[in-house]
Amino acid sequence: MEKTLKGIVLNSFDFRDYDKIITIYSNLYGKISLVCLGVNKTKSKNKYAINYLSYSNFEIFKAKNKLGLSKLKRSELINSFSHIATDFNLYVYANVLTSLVMNLEDHMKNYNLFKILKLSIFLINSKPNISFKVCILFMFYFLKIIGNQINLTVCGFCNSKINPIIAISFTNYCSSCKFCYFDDCLIIDNQLKNFINSIVKDDFIASLNQKISNQNLKILTKFVLSYYKDQVGIFTTSMYLLSTINQFK
C-alpha cells in the first residue's frame, strides 16, 4: 500500500549496482528501512533526498509485514542540513543522535522523538554555538525514551528529597547529598544543579533555554557517556569521538 511520510535519513548503504537501502526515522512509523531502486543512477531524481541527515518527504510502498522491506517510490528533499558536513564537531554531534536512534527497534513509533530529533539536527546545523548543549540534552532525553532515565534530583544513596544535592557520583551514577558524599563524588555548582533539575522536570526546549557553562557541559558529557557505556550497553563510534575530541579533554 502507498503511504506518504516525512523522515530523517539515519543511515544508507549501497545495495547492488544502482540501488541503496536507507534507514529513516519517520513521523508515521518510527524507524523504518527502505529499498531505493536506481538512486545511484546519474539521472535519478531521488538521490538528493536520501543522503545521510536529509529531512525529506517520502512516498513509499509499505511492506505488508514488519519483516519485509518497504520500497521508495518518490522522495522530495526538505532540508539537507548541509552545514553539518562542513564541521567535524557538528558532524560528531549529529552522528551521536542518529547512532542512538539506530539502536531502536524497527517500527517503534514515538512522535515526540521524531520532533526532538528533527529540532536537534536543525539546531546543530543552524546554531553551532549551542550544538554541544543540544547533543548532550538529546542524550539525556533519549534515556527517557528507552526507559533508562536517571533521576539526579535526589540523593542516590539515602533517597532524601530534603538534603541538598552537592555532588554526583561517577561510580554509582547518582547524585549525593552532603551526608552521603564520598571521595569519588564530584562537587557541582548551583548552575549545574539547576540544569540537572531542568533535564529531569522540564521538556527539551525548556532545558535548552537553561544557562550552563562549557565546563559544566563537559562534566555532563563525561557522566552520560560513561552511563551509556556501563549501564545501557550503548557506545557507538561517534560517542567515542565525542569523548576524545579536544573540546572535551
Curated annotation (Swiss-Prot):
Any single GO CC term annotated in Swiss-Prot or TrEMBL for this entry: bacterial nucleoid
Pfam families: RecO_C, RecO_N
GO biological process: DNA recombination; double-strand break repair
The keyword DNA damage is annotated on this UniProt entry: yes
Disulphide-bonded residues: none
Keywords: DNA damage, DNA recombination, DNA repair
Family: Belongs to the RecO family.
PANTHER family linked to this entry: DNA REPAIR PROTEIN RECO
UniProt function note: Involved in DNA repair and RecF pathway recombination.
Protein's UniProt name: DNA repair protein RecO
Organism field: Mycoplasma capricolum subsp. capricolum (strain California kid / ATCC 27343 / NCTC 10154)
Annotated gene: recO
